């Protein structure tokens, strides 16, 4: 029996009344853009796309050539379809409505065009993360303020990981599903329906070089992980860290674990490293739809009411029981 394609999957979701035609079209166009990005990434040095672009983004980060190219691909692909009202990107200062010459739709698209791009030059897996919201009714030209909706309002979220194979991992609010790009056919085929994150784990993903900057609750939590079976947790833990959120979260969706990017004192003015709207929210939706959990260490990420388009948050996501344990350390410390 042949595997269902992404196109068939989306049509069946529409027939079941779970999505409408506009959302189906939007996801289809995003997936096509991801194929183009996958081709560009796979060419590497041969495509002349590696290295710095010589520009910076609103985050103050140096842009890679592939950051800029991936952003342009997503903007161009989604401009003319009539399904989108506006889009926002990690690489742009402000949101961008669809051009006046094209029809406007009902949805808002947010994306990190190439997460983990600092790893591009060393051939580590990178990816595209995206989130879909509904545009508020009666809005002719959506601006930044119309994107400021809590993650619970997402109607779809996903990422495309460019690794040994290219995979699109998607949720429409009814489970998390993985599709693998069949390059000869040019189609994404369903390879894992209803992914499930194990409730318990013995793996954690964190950048330990920042340990000296963590708050006491975080120090205590990781200290107990490092103590292993001789410590309070009573079992040994392994650490995994790729420094590409898409790659680390993909591993967790596949076999469990907890991904952690906590607040630290390196820049106390920033509440976290990762961006809420186009990193934390879509990844949290994917993980929760797979039976996992996602918090800031103190509150559920999807419940946060955003106040800024490029807002940052601490992130703890993955296996439900381990996320609850990490959160408990922080909440207990707050009560002390």
From Swiss-Prot:
CC cofactor: Mg(2+)
A single GO BP: gluconeogenesis
Pfam families in alphabetical order: FBPase, FBPase_C
InterPro entries named among the record's database cross-references: FBPase_C_dom, FBPase_class-1, FBPase_N, FBPtase
Catalytic function, reaction form: beta-D-fructose 1,6-bisphosphate + H2O = beta-D-fructose 6-phosphate + phosphate
Record text on cofactor binding: Binds 2 magnesium ions per subunit.
Binding locations of Mg(2+) 2: 112, 115, 279
Residues that coordinate or bind substrate: 115-118, 207, 273
Major location (coarse): cytoplasm
Domain of life: Bacteria
Record localization: Cytoplasm
SUPFAM superfamilies: Carbohydrate phosphatase
Assigned GO CC terms: cytosol
Residue positions binding Mg(2+) 1: 90, 112, 114
Gene Ontology molecular functions: fructose 1,6-bisphosphate 1-phosphatase activity; magnesium ion binding
Class of enzymatic activity (EC top level): hydrolase
Record's keyword terms, sorted: Carbohydrate metabolism, Cytoplasm, Hydrolase, Magnesium, Metal-binding
EC number annotated for this UniProt entry: 3.1.3.11
Pathway involvement of the protein, from the record: Carbohydrate biosynthesis; gluconeogenesis
Subunit structure: Homotetramer.
Family under the similarity heading: Belongs to the FBPase class 1 family.
PANTHER family, alphabetized: FRUCTOSE-1,6-BISPHOSPHATASE-RELATED (PTHR11556), SEDOHEPTULOSE-1,7-BISPHOSPHATASE, CHLOROPLASTIC (PTHR11556:SF35)
Protein name: Fructose-1,6-bisphosphatase class 1
Species per Swiss-Prot/TrEMBL record: Xanthomonas euvesicatoria pv. vesicatoria (strain 85-10) (Xanthomonas campestris pv. vesicatoria)
């Amino acid at each position: 029996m042949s595997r269902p394609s992404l196109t068939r999957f989306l049509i069946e979701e529409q027939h079941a009344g779970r999505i409408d035609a506009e959302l189906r079209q939007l996801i289809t166009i995003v997936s096509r853009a991801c194929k183009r990005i996958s081709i560009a990434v796979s060419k590497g040095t041969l495509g002349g796309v590696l290295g710095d672009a010589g520009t910076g983004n609103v985050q103050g980060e140096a842009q890679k050539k592939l950051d800029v190219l991936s952003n342009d691909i997503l903007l161009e692909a989604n401009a003319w379809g009539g399904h989108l009202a506006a889009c926002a990107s990690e690489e742009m200062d402000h949101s961008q409505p669809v051009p006046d010459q094209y029809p406007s739709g009902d949805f808002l698209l947010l994306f990190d065009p190439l997460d983990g791009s600092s790893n591009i030059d060393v051939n580590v897996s990178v990816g595209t993360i995206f989130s879909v919201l509904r545009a508020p009714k009666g809005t002719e030209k959506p601006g930044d303020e119309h994107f400021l909706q809590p993650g619970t309002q997402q109607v779809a979220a996903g990422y495309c990981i460019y690794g040994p194979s290219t995979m699109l991992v998607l949720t429409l609010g009814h489970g998390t599903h993985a599709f693998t790009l069949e390059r000869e056919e040019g189609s994404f085929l369903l390879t894992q329906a209803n992914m499930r994150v194990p409730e318990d784990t013995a793996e954690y993903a964190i950048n330990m070089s920042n340990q000296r900057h963590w708050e006491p609750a975080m120090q205590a939590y990781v200290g107990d992980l490092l103590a292993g079976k001789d410590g309070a947790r009573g079992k040994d833990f392994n650490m995994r860290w790729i420094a590409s959120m898409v790659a680390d979260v993909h591993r967790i969706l596949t076999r469990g674990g907890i991904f952690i990017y906590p607040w630290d004192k390196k820049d106390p003015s920033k509440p976290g490293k990762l961006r809420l709207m186009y990193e934390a929210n879509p990844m949290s939706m994917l993980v929760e739809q797979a039976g996992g959990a996602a918090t800031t260490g103190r509150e559920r990420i999807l419940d946060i009411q955003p106040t800024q388009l490029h807002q940052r948050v601490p992130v703890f996501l993955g296996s439900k029981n381990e996320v609850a344990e990490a959160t408990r350390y922080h909440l207990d410390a707050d009560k002390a």
